[in-house]
Curated annotation (Swiss-Prot):
Official protein name in the record: Protein HdcB
InterPro entries xrefs: HdcB
GO biological process, one term: L-histidine metabolic process
Annotated organism of origin: Lactobacillus sp. (strain 30a)
Record key words, sorted: Histidine metabolism
Pfam families found in the cross-reference section: HdcB
Length: 174
């Protein structure tokens, strides 16, 4: 267990989940994923616990199996209630439903906010006031700006990289 993503994941997970629930098999699966986990929820089952983790994809660890899902495969999410005894419903595009119904640790609402489908809003910048920035002169840039905003919100680029790549911001003095 050596990669830096694992260390960051472990620190985040230990803030939420008691150490006695962190099995060696779970920790090894997180380490082998190579991902830096940001959210975790623990669903209490009769035969053990299911662990739902997320960052760029989301993962389910159940019965010593670690399954990865792409966030693009999520059709819908529903928040029923928070912990203790929390419940969320995640519906995938293939019709499969993940339904942790006894969430005992983690922030259920934050988890589904990270997993829920995000749609590019196709912002329109054609009615901006003259002389104000950010202002787009070409409405075709709206989709690119939304894509940049999503990349920044998902943590793929920094705020500075967003500003540099945003065609609406003036670049004088850079």
């Amino acid at each position: 267990m050596s990669n830096s993503n694992y260390q960051v994941s472990l620190e985040r997970i230990k803030k939420v989940v008691p150490e006695e629930l962190l099995t060696n098999a779970l920790l090894a699966a997180i380490d082998n994923s190579g991902e830096r986990m940001s959210q975790i929820i623990v669903d209490k089952k009769d035969n053990g616990n299911d662990y739902y983790l997320t960052i760029h994809r989301f993962f389910v660890y159940s019965n010593e199996e670690f399954t990865a899902f792409d966030k693009e495969d999520v059709a819908d999410v529903e928040f029923v209630n928070g912990t203790p005894d929390g419940e969320v419903i995640i519906t995938l595009k293939d019709g499969k439903v993940l339904h942790p119904s006894h969430i005992c640790y983690g922030r259920a609402f934050d988890f589904i906010q990270d997993v829920k489908p995000k749609v590019i809003t196709m912002a329109g910048y054609d009615s901006t006031i003259r002389g104000e920035f950010p202002q787009l002169l070409d409405p075709d840039h709206a989709e690119e700006i939304d894509r940049l905003r999503r990349w920044m919100q998902d943590g793929n680029i920094s705020h500075y990289e967003y500003d540099d790549a945003n065609p609406a911001y003036p670049k004088a003095g850079k």
